[in-house]
Amino acid sequence: MSRVCQVTGKGPVTGNNISHANNKTRRRFLPNLQHHRFWVESEKRFVRLRVSAKGMRIIDKRGIDAVLVDIRKAGAKV
């Protein structure tokens, strides 16, 4: 399973670690992903999503039903 948020689409990005001596080494910045179960009242079941912390805030704001419509429209099986 890839490290991508199912709500926002955020994934890893690359950058540099920079030491005190200004030496640069490559690194990855990973999104803050969590596996979370959401209760979907209209379907009377739990849905398990891999979402970032920002994705959880979007679900709180818009509602799980509206977010699931967008996820399913993008072609993901949920």
Curated annotation (Swiss-Prot):
InterPro entries (alphabetical): Ribosomal_bL28 (IPR026569), Ribosomal_bL28/bL31-like_sf (IPR034704), Ribosomal_bL28_bact-type (IPR001383), Ribosomal_bL28_sf (IPR037147)
Pfam families, per database record: Ribosomal_L28
SUPFAM superfamilies referenced in this protein's UniProt entry, alphabetically: L28p-like
This protein's record includes keyword Hydrolase: no
Region feature Disordered, mapped onto this chain: 1-20
Entry keyword set: Ribonucleoprotein, Ribosomal protein
GO molecular function: structural constituent of ribosome
Phosphoprotein found in the keyword field: no
GO CC annotation: cytosolic large ribosomal subunit
GO BP annotations listed: translation
Family from the record: Belongs to the bacterial ribosomal protein bL28 family.
Name of the protein in its database record: Large ribosomal subunit protein bL28
Naturally occurring in which organism (per UniProt): Pseudomonas putida (strain ATCC 47054 / DSM 6125 / CFBP 8728 / NCIMB 11950 / KT2440)
